[in-house]
Amino acid sequence: MVFGQLYALFIFTLSCCISKTVQADSSKESSSFISFDKESNWDTISTISSTADVISSVDSAIAVFEFDNFSLLDNLMIDEEYPFFNRFFANDVSLTVHDDSPLNISQSLSPIMEQFTVDELPESASDLLYEYSLDDKSIVLFKFTSDAYDLKKLDEFIDSCLSFLEDKSGDNLTVVINSLGWAFEDEDGDDEYATEETLSHHDNNKGKEGDDDILSSIWTEGLLMCLIVSALLLFILIVALSWISNLDITYGALEKSTNPIKKNN
């Protein structure tokens, strides 16, 4: 009876975890980290509500790096050196936007947008870009579709892509990195976007520590659920062992019965 109850509790807990995981995966919230080169762009995004609005509003060339199935920040290691990522997240990010759904750029921008789908990273950015003429394109979108990337190679690849695009755009380039999941929160607790002043103060006073603050704040729902499940399973094990240790096992039924009246021959 007790084992039946424990088993039912285990199944219920497992079902809840699976339901949470499916729900989180279906929503696919995303966060965008945006770097502006032109101060004038701040005047055009005062009423933005999504990353797509930012892309539609800025008047400079835009490079968008979208990760469909890969949470970039969840995979960045604090103790590793990534030249581009460290510089970008610590010093270059001007605006952070949290979206309730994956990035969806307006179809009206298709004539001025070039899209590259990146499953496996090419050997170099030139292998991907040099065959295309991007002179008439204001938006270049890189869609990363894999769920795993070598971060050092990814760091080098994105840096090379931006160097190529900056040459084309005359160093006037807005950079958008869109990743699944967690969004940066500013000092006021606003997770939709941070103001330029807040981020500027953060960068000037903390410098390199800004990157560590961002990465060290990562705490995914999946990891939290794993810890909860582990705690519940440990509790179930302790209860089961306690119940077994309290069993009073009687061996009398196993002993061979003897008839004291029967005489020995």
Curated annotation (Swiss-Prot):
Keywords: Endoplasmic reticulum, Glycoprotein, Membrane, Signal, Transmembrane, Transmembrane helix, Vacuole. Residues 25-223 are vacuolar. Its main location: membrane. The keyword Transmembrane helix applies. It is found in: Vacuole membrane; Endoplasmic reticulum membrane. Disruption phenotype: Reduces association of VMA6 with the V-type proton ATPase. Decreases VPH1 protein level. A motif (ER retention motif) lies at residues 262-265. Pfam families: Ac45-VOA1_TM (PF20520). GO terms for cellular component: endoplasmic reticulum membrane; fungal-type vacuole membrane; Golgi membrane; proton-transporting V-type ATPase complex; vacuolar proton-transporting V-type ATPase complex; vacuolar proton-transporting V-type ATPase, V0 domain. GO terms for biological process: endosomal lumen acidification; Golgi lumen acidification; protein-containing complex assembly; proton transmembrane transport; vacuolar acidification. Residues 245-265 are cytoplasmic. GO terms for molecular function: proton-transporting ATPase activity, rotational mechanism. V-ATPase is a heteromultimeric enzyme composed of a peripheral catalytic V1 complex (components A to H) attached to an integral membrane V0 proton pore complex (components: a, c, c', c'', d, e, f and VOA1). Interacts with VMA21. Associates with the assembling V0 complex. Accessory component of the V0 complex of vacuolar(H+)-ATPase (V-ATPase), a multisubunit enzyme composed of a peripheral complex (V1) that hydrolyzes ATP and a membrane integral complex (V0) that translocates protons. V-ATPase is responsible for acidifying and maintaining the pH of intracellular compartments. Functions with VMA21 in assembly of the V0 complex. This is V0 assembly protein 1.
